[in-house]
Structure formats: structure tokens, C-alpha cells
Amino acid sequence: VVQALIHAKSLLAILATQVLLMGAVEGYRAGNTAPGQFGEDLDRLYPGGPFDPLGLADDPDTFPELKVKEIKNGRLAMSGMLGFYAQAIVTGEGPVENWLYHLQDPSAHNGLTALVTQFAPTPVALL
């Protein structure tokens, strides 16, 4: 199972590990709130402590705005990772190798030229 996780060969192993780890973390977080206090006021486990060295979450007025910003930045990061995964699947190389290949000749090695040259329609014989 560990080899499948390291080399990302088993999607089911990765999914099961993700569900177990996130379930444990969220269970711990939900279990550390007083009964009837879940979702009220500021959650003492999120965000803060060592993850908030500037004390940005101390103000209850800006806390909801910071939560929305965190969600949006997380979605943006996931979209970027999806691009990395798609690029790795198509080219068989990682993002650094693809970037270095692009830097060799940016006008010839880019997404548009790859799209035009690799997916050009081929002539079809009409019956």
C-alpha cells in the first residue's frame, strides 16, 4: 500500500488514505468543542495558534472574510494542481521538466503549438 501511495499508482489507496486521515483530523476538531457550541463564535482549533502567528483570526469581524479567502485560495491551489496532474498525464513528465522544455524555445514549446500540431484533423475518406 505504501508503494502505491508514494508513486500514486492506486487511486483507491490514495482515496482511502485521504478519507481516513481527514476523517481523523475532522473528528478530533469536532470532538474538542463543547456540546451545543459547534459552529458558534470562533472555533478554538481553527485557525490560530501556531498557524496564525500574526493573530489575524482574533478579530470576530474579519474572521468570516478570512475563512472565505482561505476557501478561495484553496480552490485556486487545487485548480493549479489539477493543471500539473493533467500536464504530467499528457507529457509523462513533471511540471519542472515541462517548464525547462518550454524555456528552451518558448515560441515553439507552448500549449498552443502543442494543441495545433498534435491534434490536427486527419483527412477522412468519404464513402
Curated annotation (Swiss-Prot):
Any Gene Ontology biological process: photosynthesis, light harvesting
UniProt-annotated binding residues for chlorophyll b 2: 6
UniProt membrane topology term: Multi-pass membrane protein
Signal sequence residues: none
Mod. after translation: Photoregulated by reversible phosphorylation of its threonine residues.
Membrane-crossing residue ranges in chain numbering: 11-28, 76-92
Cofactor notes: Binds at least 14 chlorophylls (8 Chl-a and 6 Chl-b) and carotenoids such as lutein and neoxanthin.
Keyword Membrane belongs to the record: yes
Alphabetic keyword roster: Chlorophyll, Chloroplast, Chromophore, Magnesium, Membrane, Metal-binding, Phosphoprotein, Photosynthesis, Photosystem I, Photosystem II, Plastid, Thylakoid, Transmembrane, Transmembrane helix
A GO molecular function held by the record: metal ion binding
Residues that coordinate or bind chlorophyll a 5: 69, 87
PANTHER family: CHLOROPHYLL A/B BINDING PROTEIN
UniProt-recorded name of the protein: Chlorophyll a-b binding protein of LHCII type 1
Species in which this protein is naturally found: Euglena gracilis
